[in-house]
Amino acid sequence: DGPPARSIGEDVGGLFEIWNTDGNLIDTTDSIDRADTDIVLSPPENGSKFRYFQINPTPEGVPIEIMQEIAADAFEKIGAAHHRIDTSKHPAMHKTDTIDYIILLKGDVTLILDEEEVRLKPHDVVVQRGTNHAWVNNGDEPALLIAVLIDSDLI
């Protein structure tokens, strides 16, 4: 019924909140915009997040130290510094205790994982189960993805 209530990080890509749940109980009579809250990467316990996210192309020639600083700042702003457990493969590597359903809507993106890299084309679907990962835009235009993140107990 309108644009996303909240967004953050448009200068490097961005997160655009559509809907959030904070548990398993849903009040069907309230009219609260559940996306109009502070943006954090992960959903709360037993909660979920439904969002768009945009990945801008990485400018050529940016030193890895600068990319590390940008990534650290971006994750700090969304309460996710603790999710950056191993950034040796890419500065934006992170891991959440969630199951994620992600669809690439437009663009040319590579999903970097600990053991492999997967190049995606529009309409490809990714199911992530608590993996350490990063996204890289291979194109000249911003890439747009949509994601559902569901809090999970990983084993």
Regions found by a protein language model. Name each.
Residues D22-A35, V40-P43, D151-I155:
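Non-heme Fe(II)/2-oxoglutarate
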Residues Y52, Y101, E117, V125-V127, ...:
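Conserved hydrophobic/aromatic beta-strand scaffold that supports enzyme active sites
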Residues K49-T96, R129-N132:
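Conserved short histidine dyad/triad with adjacent acidic residue
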Residues E117-K121, G130-L154:
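Ligand-binding loop in jelly-roll beta-barrel domains
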Residues F16-E17, F50, I102, H133:
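A broad, low-specificity signal marking well-ordered, structured residues that form hydrophobic/aromatic
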Residues D1-R34:
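N-terminal leader/capping segments at the start of a protein or of a new domain
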Residues S88-P122:
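A short beta-strand-loop-beta hairpin characteristic of the jelly-roll/cupin
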